């Protein structure tokens, strides 16, 4: 299991939100490229970049994403946020991202099938859960699907690289990830899963590492790295124990 530092972009800055709320923002850097480079220099194998402007319907920051990708090369970068059509997915891949993270449109079976055909193993499907349902449109609306139902539908139709599971109620809280739900999603879907949301300590990472054999490939860590609650080298050591 690997640790994937998160770099969330909003209005040109590096920020973290709490529970996905645009009005609960903490700015950690005015220079996202420098922040991404810092994580790469400290040993990150992969970065998770989220374009929050795109997620909330504002113009996407493709140029900034391209700068980050170039600055951290050869570290792999996955990019999400507002990728709701084929052109948007293609744009981030052309900007150098290794994977595009798709959320809202993943509920459309035809779209998932087309993604698998056009970009095999280059797409990660975000499974964002709130109150037992999949949230969409920047985590604002709830769908009728459960996370397991979405994962099984994706497995049937698309050649995706992984699922990114986030328990929204824990995101940005540092209160611990939903280990049980993450492991269950990995086991039942048969698709590699990246855990996200709530990591606040090395114990949280160790808890995920302990069940990594269920199919948990990595964990995205945001606020805990930025506040210093955990260091990246220590987090990587804790995660590797479950590899």
PLM features: residue spans?
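Glycine-rich, proline-tolerant flexible connector loops at the mouths of alpha/beta enzymes
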Residues: 46-64, 164-174
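Conserved, mostly hydrophobic/aromatic
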Residues: 8, 39, 47, 92, ...
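C-terminal helical cap(s) of enzyme catalytic domains, especially alpha/beta-barrels
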Residues: 110-118, 123, 209-212, 216-243
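Catalytic cores of alpha/beta
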Residues: 72, 77-99, 111, 180-217, ...
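Short, acidic/polar
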Residues: 28-40, 84-90, 143-154
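Charged helix-capping and loop-helix junction motifs
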Residues: 59-66, 140-149, 175-184
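Conserved anion-binding
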Residues: 11-23, 90, 97-171
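Structural preference for beta-strand elements that scaffold enzyme active sites
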Residues: 2-6, 46, 74-78, 98-101, ...
């Amino acid at each position: 299991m690997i640790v994937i530092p998160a770099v969330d972009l909003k209005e040109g800055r590096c920020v973290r939100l709490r529970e996905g709320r645009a009005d609960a923002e903490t700015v950690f850097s005015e220079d996202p490229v420098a922040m991404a480079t810092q994580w790469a220099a400290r040993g990150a194998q992969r970065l998770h970049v989220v374009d929050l402007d795109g997620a909330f319907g504002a113009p996407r920051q493709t140029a900034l994403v391209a700068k980050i990708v170039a600055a951290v090369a050869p570290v792999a970068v996955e990019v999400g946020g507002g990728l709701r059509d084929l052109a948007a997915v293609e744009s981030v891949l052309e900007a150098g991202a290794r994977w595009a993270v798709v959320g809202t449109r993943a509920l459309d079976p035809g779209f998932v099938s087309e993604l698998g055909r056009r970009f095999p193993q280059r797409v990660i499907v975000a499974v964002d859960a709130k109150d037992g349902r999949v949230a969409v449109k920047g985590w604002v609306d709830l769908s009728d699907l459960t996370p397991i139902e979405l994962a099984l539908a994706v497995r049937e139709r698309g050649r995706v690289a992984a699922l990114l599971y986030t328990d929204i109620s824990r995101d940005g809280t540092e209160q611990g990830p939903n280990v049980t739900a993450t492991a269950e999603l990995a086991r039942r879907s048969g698709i590699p899963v990246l855990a996200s949301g709530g990591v606040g300590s090395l114990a949280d990472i160790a808890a995920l590492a302990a069940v990594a054999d269920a199919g948990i490939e990595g964990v995205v860590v945001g606020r805990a790295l930025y506040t210093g609650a955990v260091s990246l080298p220590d987090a990587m050591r804790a995660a590797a124990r479950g590899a």
